Amino acid sequence: MKQYRKQLQIRWADLDPNGHIRHSVYYDWGAYSRIAFLTENGLSPSRMMELQVGPVIFREECVFKKEIRLEDTLYIDLELLQARRDFSRWTMQHLLYKESGTLAAVLTLNGAWMDTIKRKLTVPPELVFDAYEVMPKSADFEWMD
């Protein structure tokens, strides 16, 4: 897959007192993008529950580059930056763009897959592997060996 992009809906409730997007909304948008991608590739939250696995995040960071306001049209991309070959651990990146093409924010996160019964990190099942295999890779993607 070359690119995964979603248009975002900016709501009044997403604004802070300064009239721009509240910092925590960026993280919500990232989660929305990731779950949408996984669902569209056969790995819905209910399917994860059936498989008894779920993603866990170790670190999540947002770099704010341009102000985003209510009237802006905004898009979010999803890319895989790094991964183990079994996709048990990974680093993803979300790029948030204004309609003009201006990069507004970069959200980066490190995570893994957890067995939701044992509550331990695990190698994910084949369905997870299949979804990650088609996830767009960044230009500088590298395997974590």
Ranges and model annotations:
Residues 1-59, 115-145:
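Hot-dog-fold acyl-thioester-processing enzymes
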Residues 6, 68-73, 81-145:
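HotDog/MaoC-like acyl-thioester-processing domains
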Residues 38-89, 104:
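Hydrophobic beta-strand-centered segment that forms part of the acyl-chain substrate-binding groove
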